[in-house]
Amino acid sequence: MPTDTLSPPPWERIVADVADALIFIDGAGVIRAWNAGAEALFGFSAAQALGQSVDLIIPPHLRAAHWRGFEHAMRRGATSRGAAVRTTRGLHQDGRKLYVDMSFAVVKDADGRVLGSAAMARDATARYLAEQARRAAAG
């Protein structure tokens, strides 16, 4: 089938159905997009998460550092590490602290104005704990 006859990709379905957590927060840090992967990872339904501060999934001891980095990225229009994946902590609805591999991107409109931040996340808890156990056994 020629590609010029294909309709545009169904981005909303892709975002909704991808296994990884996809989250968008606006410039004030309010959750505006939350897919099924985010529901599975953090335990909050979209109805529970949308409209809430992203503090919902950030452990209390990491919130100040998060907000410093977020505000810097919003002012600068870019994250300090680009789209590099980093392992950080997340907070599940049941109170468990997770290890989460996350990448972030500042989202801008067509005129270059910063709209907020998008994050892609994946559970890294099992891998992180296995690495810790290997280090402890080796050392």
List each language-model region with its residue ranges:
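PAS-family sensory domains and close relatives that share small-molecule sensor folds
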Residues: 92-94, 103-109, 120
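Sensory modules in modular signal-transduction proteins
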Residues: 4-39, 82, 139
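PAS-family sensory domains
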Residues: 113-123
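PAS/LOV-family and closely related PAS-like sensory domains
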Residues: 46, 58-100
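Sensory-domain boundary/capping and coupling elements
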Residues: 9, 128-139
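Charged alpha-helical signal-transmission linkers that cap and connect PAS-family sensory domains
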Residues: 108-111, 128-129
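PAS/PAS-like sensory domain cap-loop motif
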Residues: 36-49, 110
